[in-house]
Amino acid sequence: MYWVNGQRRNEVPIHDRSFQYGDGCFTTILTKEGQVQQWSSHKARLQACLDILHIPEPNWDRVWQGLQSMILPQEKAGLKIHISRGLGGRGYSPTQVSESIVTISAFAFPAHYQAWRDKGLAVGICQQRMGLNPLLAGHKHNNRLEQILLKREMDNAGWDDGVCLDINGKVIETTAANIFWCRDGTMFTPCLRHAGVAGVARRQILELAQQQEIPIVIDEFTLEDLLSAEEVFITNALLEVAPVTQIGQQRLTIGSMTRRFQESSNS
């Protein structure tokens, strides 16, 4: 059952432009004990993507009510907000499109995430490369084919996740998370000017680092930069913060900075 523009439905229309063209955006939200986490940040990110796609904003009060009605009664669970430009229009042209369509769905918290948070992940290095798209970089739009192909590659190779590089060999993210690493008391993360998704959890970590006066460098980095790290962790809204204990053949220890941010982001 889905929440669709204020109504409960079991299906979505085939003429929805998100189904036809991936014309929209989405976000995935963590709930804890029935409470929506980081809503203001999720809303801001959705609005930024809607603005770049020229999709009218929905009634956010109604969306909030929809979220509340869909929360699963579990210690941890997830909600997905999917916003489509709407129905209709001939071909790619959006000039004859109806109002935007907001769909909310609920799902159980991934069972393996807690083990990843506690013990860490082993990640590979994706051989396929991400393209450059500065117009849409940072936004979580509904076209995720690159991530699907990269995740398929890592699944077939037996890794938990994979480090994604762009066509110029710069580190961008993993297939499902943003990536941070630490060396000599300084934290590093890719800038995402040309590719990747700027996650809500990434934003939270950047804010926490600033509050705690931890030096952080946001720039373009090579794989060699990443492999010189003393500790590495990844973030997304559901997983929050999880340590990386292996990148390819290189082993890593779980560092104090990682545990510090796990504690800070969970408070």
Curated annotation (Swiss-Prot):
InterPro entries, A to Z: Aminodeoxychorismate_lyase_IV, Aminotrans_IV, Aminotrans_IV_CS, Aminotransferase-like, BCAT-like_C, BCAT-like_N, Class-IV_PLP-Dep_Aminotrnsfr
Keyword Transcription attached: no
Residues carrying N6-(pyridoxal phosphate)lysine: K140
Any one GO MF annotation of this record: pyridoxal phosphate binding
PROSITE patterns xrefs: AA_TRANSFER_CLASS_4
Metabolic or biological pathway: Cofactor biosynthesis; tetrahydrofolate biosynthesis; 4-aminobenzoate from chorismate: step 2/2
Positions in coiled-coil regions: none
Catalytic activity: 4-amino-4-deoxychorismate = 4-aminobenzoate + pyruvate + H(+)
EC number(s) recorded for this UniProt protein: 4.1.3.38
Tagged with keyword rRNA-binding: no
Enzyme class: lyase
GO CC terms in record: cytosol
Keywords assigned: Folate biosynthesis, Lyase, Pyridoxal phosphate
SUPFAM superfamilies xref list: D-aminoacid aminotransferase-like PLP-dependent enzymes
GO biological process: 4-aminobenzoate biosynthetic process; folic acid biosynthetic process; tetrahydrofolate biosynthetic process
Cofactor: pyridoxal 5'-phosphate
Similarity comment: Belongs to the class-IV pyridoxal-phosphate-dependent aminotransferase family.
Role this protein plays: Involved in the biosynthesis of p-aminobenzoate (PABA), a precursor of tetrahydrofolate. Converts 4-amino-4-deoxychorismate into 4-aminobenzoate (PABA) and pyruvate.
Oligomer and partners: Homodimer.
Protein name: Aminodeoxychorismate lyase
Record organism: Vibrio cholerae serotype O1 (strain ATCC 39315 / El Tor Inaba N16961)
